[in-house]
């Protein structure tokens, strides 16, 4: 019996926010934000509100903030790819945040390498939102720059060695647990340095995709990360990051459809950026809207159709190395 497709549809309006997901959450510029665990727990230090807690080979999260709010400098041990749904966002990187910066807007993609410090901030005049793909079922933990942990401690927030957070203004640190010490200078030097031109190779701008395909009709496919196979085509990636645990592509077109059904033995999700999309899964169908997430049942035959002009939809697939 085929599962009811609505059980695998995660609507943006139903996402459950975590208001204090990280140790920095009481610092100025980090208070007015919501973090979402859409698929899997992600790397939040306050585990709550997972929309779909089923291993997919990757995690999907989201963050929305008020203007001038964002995230402090941090590093990951697995991939972190940002999909901008509403901007603008400024990204900055380096141990002190001064190695480079870039402003990205709706539809832009950036894939940050591991073992580097990066942060971001909403530099618009309204609330902005973006989704993040984190590699693997267990994406590891966040490593914060030393200054973040020191400043957070002054607000009463401490990060423990087991990656849990304690607000010492409201509770005591458990006797059997220890506070995580900030990185020392030698440890900071082990993180990689990237120039602006290096990170530019990790960015795909939405405007460039649109201008290159204005005259095309029907469905168009692109691959951001890893070779992407669809509609009897194999698409080469535009970003040369690999072994991340997932492949990442997109489909766009004006009121067009993928005619042939296909199936996969691994997980696949759809996330519209623009327009409504109808998803056909064997004898069922469902409509998904921008910022919704639909996880297709494994092995089920599926195809999709763009219902609006200028439809654009992300596709993320589990990749077993």
Protein language model regions, located:
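A short, N-terminal "cap"/entry segment at the start of jelly-roll beta-barrel domains
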Residues: 1-56, 161-252
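Short acidic-glycine-tyrosine-enriched beta hairpin
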Residues: 95-113, 282-299
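A generic "binding-loop/recognition-motif" signal
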Residues: 69, 77-78, 116-117, 126, ...
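Short histidine-centered beta-strand/loop micro-motifs
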Residues: 48-53, 70-76, 93, 101-102, ...
């Amino acid at each position: 019996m085929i599962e009811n497709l609505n059980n695998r549809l995660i609507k943006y309006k139903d996402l459950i926010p975590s208001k204090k997901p990280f140790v920095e959450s009481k610092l100025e510029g980090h208070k007015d934000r919501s973090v979402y665990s859409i698929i899997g727990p992600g790397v939040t230090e306050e585990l709550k509100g997972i929309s779909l807690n089923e291993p997919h080979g990757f995690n999907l999260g989201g963050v929305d903030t008020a203007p001038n709010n964002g995230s402090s400098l941090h590093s990951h041990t697995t991939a972190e790819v940002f999909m901008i749904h509403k901007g603008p966002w400024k990204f900055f990187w380096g141990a002190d945040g001064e190695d480079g910066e870039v402003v990205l807007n709706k539809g832009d993609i950036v894939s940050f390498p591991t073992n580097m410090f990066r942060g971001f901030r909403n530099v618009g005049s309204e609330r902005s939102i973006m989704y993040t793909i984190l590699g693997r079922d267990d994406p590891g933990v966040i490593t914060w720059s030393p200054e973040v942990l020191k400043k957070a401690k002054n607000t009463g927030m401490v990060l423990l060695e087991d990656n849990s957070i304690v607000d010492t203004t409201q509770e005591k640190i458990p006797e059997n647990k220890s506070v995580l010490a900030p990185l020392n200078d030698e440890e900071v030097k082990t993180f990689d340095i990237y120039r602006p031109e290096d990170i530019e190779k990790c960015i795909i701008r939405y405007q460039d995709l649109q201008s290159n395909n204005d005259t095309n009709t029907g469905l168009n496919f692109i691959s951001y990360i890893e070779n992407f196979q669809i509609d009897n085509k194999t698409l080469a990636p535009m970003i040369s990051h690999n072994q991340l645990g997932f492949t990442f592509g997109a489909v766009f077109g004006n009121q067009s459809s993928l005619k042939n059904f296909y199936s996969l033995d691994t997980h696949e999700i759809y996330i519209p950026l623009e327009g409504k999309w109808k998803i056909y899964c064997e004898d069922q169908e469902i409509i998904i809207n921008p910022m919704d997430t639909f996880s297709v049942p494994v092995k089920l035959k599926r195809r999709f159709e763009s219902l609006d002009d200028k439809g654009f939809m992300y596709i993320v697939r589990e990749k077993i190395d």
